[in-house]
Amino acid sequence: MTSDALTIPSELESALRLRTVQYFITKRPWLDLYGVHVRPVPPFGSTSRKPHFDPALIHRCLPDELLFEVFARMMPYDLGRASCVCRKWRYTVRNPMFWRNACLKAWQTAGVIENYKILQSKYDGSWRKMWLLRSRVRTDGLYVSRNTYIRAGIAEWKITNPVHIVCYYRYIRFYPSGRFLYKNSSQKLKDVAKYMNFKASKSENLYKGTYTLSMSDDKIEAAVLYPGTRPTVLRIRLRLRGTAIGANNRMDLLSLVTSGVNDEEISSTEEDILGLVEGWEDDETHNPDIPAVSHKRGMTAFVFVPFEEVDESVLNLPPEKMDYYVTG
């Protein structure tokens, strides 16, 4: 009797406590769904004991074989964007075959054997690591140098000392073969990008040249021939850099020199202009009528703009909206 008398008050006390708690707790049935992982059942008639995982719709439409063929035809920077879609694509993009093709195309002037030696000695046999860390010029867009200067205007009856902000551009498009196109114009980026190729007509004033990239100091030596009655060679020296690893989206303009050349030299080395001026001094010229001139104006750094961004780039803004552009 004594033990029963002791247990009854404790049971009543717990019941009263639960009744009091019910007033403070709101019933939320959806909370019961948290932590419950619903796994799909295997198809009817399947003899497999492994758990069945239903793939996403995009994975059903693109089997692994077709996905591999699509990635094999994509540009390297498009592969980087595709790796952000899902985990499966990220693992697929790490296939070394994609990056091997990109590396051999980017450094095709060095040769296959030399690229394999550099791969094993510096990048631990990883083509993707080589693509990210080795210096290279980008060929999927244009390098643009936007330059502005102030020019005095004509005095009018309202304005006594008018000034104008003049804007012009230097455009460079590189090719993996060691050739490039150069243009100096006041036209906007979105207009020049349409015809910046070797198929452009002579009226577009595109100049062809050759270049080399030094892997030791990331410097680019380039030369362009200005044809005409008095042929002139434009020698360009640049330093390649990037705002992020593997970006290679900036080029500092170190020097810009124009020199005269002989007609005999042009006829013998018309395709390899850089080989013609190799070893020349900055003040050297081979035509006494055309002295060597080292230009100091218009030395703004080049900024890389991919082809898919030329229409929306801020470099298209007029001087009234952007008088100066900080390259960074």
From Swiss-Prot:
GO terms for cellular component: cytoplasm; mitochondrion; nucleus; pollen tube. Signal peptide: none annotated. Residues 126-158 are annotated as: Mystery domain 1 (MD1). Pfam families: F-box, FBO_C. Expressed in leaves, flowers and stems, and, to a lower extent, in roots and siliques. PROSITE patterns: FBOX (PS50181). It comes from the Eukaryota. Residues 163-201 are annotated as: Mystery domain 2 (MD2). Pathway: Protein modification; protein ubiquitination. Disulfide bonds: none annotated. CDD domains: F-box_AtGID2-like. Residues 56-102 form the F-box domain. It is found in: Nucleus; Mitochondrion. Induction: By temperature stresses. PANTHER family: F-BOX ONLY PROTEIN 48 (PTHR12874:SF9), F-BOX ONLY PROTEIN 48-RELATED (PTHR12874). The F-box is necessary for the interaction with ASK proteins. This is F-box protein 7. It comes from Arabidopsis thaliana. The lineage of its organism: Eukaryota, Viridiplantae, Streptophyta, Embryophyta, Tracheophyta.
